[in-house]
Amino acid sequence: MAKPLTDQEKRRQISIRGIVGVENVAELKKGFNRHLHFTLVKDRNVATPRDYYFALAHTVRDHLVGRWIRTQQHYYDKCPKRVYYLSLEFYMGRTLQNTMINLGLQNACDEAIYQLGLDMEELEEIEEDAGLGNGGLGRLAACFLDSMATLGLAAYGYGIRYEYGIFNQKIREGWQVEEADDWLRHGNPWEKARPEFMLPVHFYGRVEHTQAGTKWVDTQVVLALPYDTPVPGYMNNTVNTMRLWSARAPNDFNLQDFNVGDYIQAVLDRNLAENISRVLYPNDNFFEGKELRLKQEYFVVAATLQDVIRRFKASKFGSKDGVGTVFDAFPDQVAIQLNDTHPALAIPELMRIFVDIEKLPWSKAWEITKKTFAYTNHTVLPEALERWPVDLVEKLLPRHLQIIYEINQKHLDRIVALFPKDIDRMRRMSLIEEEGGKRINMAHLCIVGCHAVNGVAKIHSDIVKTQVFKDFSELEPDKFQNKTNGITPRRWLLLCNPGLADLIAEKIGEDYVKDLSQLTKLHSFVGDDIFLREIAKVKQENKLKFSQFLEKEYKVKINPSSMFDVHVKRIHEYKRQLLNCLHVITMYNRIKKDPKKFFVPRTVIIGGKAAPGYHMAKMIIKLVTSVAEVVNNDPMVGSKLKVIFLENYRVSLAEKVIPATDLSEQISTAGTEASGTGNMKFMLNGALTIGTMDGANVEMAEEAGEENLFIFGMRVDDVAALDKKGYEAKEYYEALPELKLVIDQIDNGFFSPNQPDLFKDIINMLFYHDRFKVFADYEAYVKCQEKVSQLYMNQKAWNTMVLRNIAASGKFSSDRTIREYAKDIWNMEPSDLKISLSKESSNGVNANGK
């Protein structure tokens, strides 16, 4: 059980984690016991640890609701511009500890739970991750919500309340096996259902043209039931809302069709409608054109836009003239950010509402729509770009297809006027692709229908402008921007690495939590040996703690004084976990060749999920686990080298492994990783980076100095040159004896003696269709890794470099990113007002839920 803090520790933490005050603690204990009794209907004799978690969650939630209501009243009174962040993914992780930190309740809660004879850490571990995302894109949305609340922006996250989030990954005999993530099984204390705001969403049907205008009729209706989750800002009394929609069948669903009287079957068929919000599609950077997925995309968009318009009409700006609402002020009151193309149907849907329902002329509707929407691009991989078959859209959303055709016609008219003879340019820029079955290019729809398009790191935004959407940026160069991604320092430092957060606060004060650029002040301590030792001590404590966790959870013993070399992210060929694997085998071979030679001990930790249908990614996991099996059981290797595959990598596991990491692997082929955010988390937590000049690594090197990262391998231009020349994997295989040995071992069954040809698909890919050129960077990577080992032996030099990285990581706060979106795209002003809680929180009748 965690012991209570000493007075000195309390003083040190007072501002960051709140004041412990006797009254606070007494009140929290009272709230806890009240919830145990009245909410959970248990006493201490029969309560389980899960009951205690729920009692604590409800107690903390009590401290949110007044602020939540008060924030919504404040927005209702002041009518600020609102921003709506539309995303099919919100990878939130756990909520309890983050809420305690942002409300300044952590110390008081720790003390209360200790006095109640319970273990806070045990209770925190009971909470399920809200895994409503695959990886970076969904986690970015979660960080952005935290920053928007902390900056006092009137912001709403809108998405889907998936009943099953990203699958739980089990490793059986070295293979990934997926299990359903029934995260709501025990209930979710953080959400509030809002059935009073339930809205209809239409599918199928047909389009009718009448005197009065166009109507979409004979549709199937599914209801969207909103669940609200509070999003607290850091210590500013702002609590914003994430509203997730759940699909419900209407009460008369299918009953009108069953004249025969098969009432039971009609009720059972309600499941078909409700399947829309059943499960998150587990693809990262890959497009799967399934009807259910298209339904999900339209479902979230249709429900959200009705909600946005309802809220606009209820405000003083939604003024009426004789006929209906005047929407001129709409873009001054509403900004909608599309997180990738997944919510792209919002563009034709808003046009449908304006033109068909609100009876606006097309040109007016289009002008308002364009001013309202902005689009963030997240990937340049062609297989990830959404291209929906026209016949599927025609069946599911016939009116939207007509609107998309109309948008495209006007768009192409413009192209033809500007480039009269350039037919190929029209083909390239059309929203409709003709070759191989008609498809709608959703990225093109977004670019045409938005006033701003941004990439997520400088290098990525350049590639977007000069390669992927070159024609569009020639047409409207001012539309294209860069907004380098960021991470929230609340979760990714205060919560996951309290030792480091406190150490920094001792040196520079605690204001850095809301202004991470202040970390540059740490540069003045690079010569302070005592401070460097303290930083190293925090890292060692984190490594020890993680080692104990691994031993308990995975029954693996590792050497906590070895270098922790960590590669955690989705398993994908472009992220090149294979390159890491080849290096592991190379190190193994070197130890075996000369066992007496000194070797810097390493624990290589690789983790991440493979999409269930991605054969190559699953083979990569099997290779890693097979190599681990051989390496970890070779007595000649002993504790010099260990390989761990980290099962079921997720937000709550990232919070454990990142603070314990020495070396962060960011080794995608240059030009393939849009930004990455794991790289930033490692940097902030005192790991050094080995990486290519890709994504945000480029800007990390810019901030810290390239000499303070381990940069290797081809740059974007080198990759292009190699493509032009023709990449011949065999040349590298023949020229590099160590690489040849490694590949031969994999090929001849050294790591799969019972199935010698198990990895033939990997070998075949590496030689004949490796788009990501693993062999081309192998030599540079291995050499760079030798430099890493050398530096690790000089702990003072290593820790100096660590401090330089931490001091340079301030740019990568999502607060900075959101300030840039607010200024350059949304035209909104962050507010540092601490909302007053004085107004009676119970009198907000007309503000409630608005």
Curated annotation (Swiss-Prot):
Residues recorded with modification Phosphoserine: S15, S524, S561, S639
Site (Involved in the association of subunits): C109, C143
Annotated PROSITE patterns: PHOSPHORYLASE (PS00102)
CDD domains xref list: GT35_Glycogen_Phosphorylase (cd04300)
N6-succinyllysine modifications at: K364
Modified residues (N6-acetyllysine): K470, K796
Binding site for AMP: D43, R44, N45, Y76, R310
Oligomeric and partner information: Homodimer; enzymatically active. Interacts with PPP1R3B; recruits the phosphatase PP1 which dephosphorylates and inactivates PYGL/glycogen phosphorylase.
Function statement: Allosteric enzyme that catalyzes the rate-limiting step in glycogen catabolism, the phosphorolytic cleavage of glycogen to produce glucose-1-phosphate, and plays a central role in maintaining cellular and organismal glucose homeostasis.
UniProt-recorded name of the protein: Glycogen phosphorylase, liver form
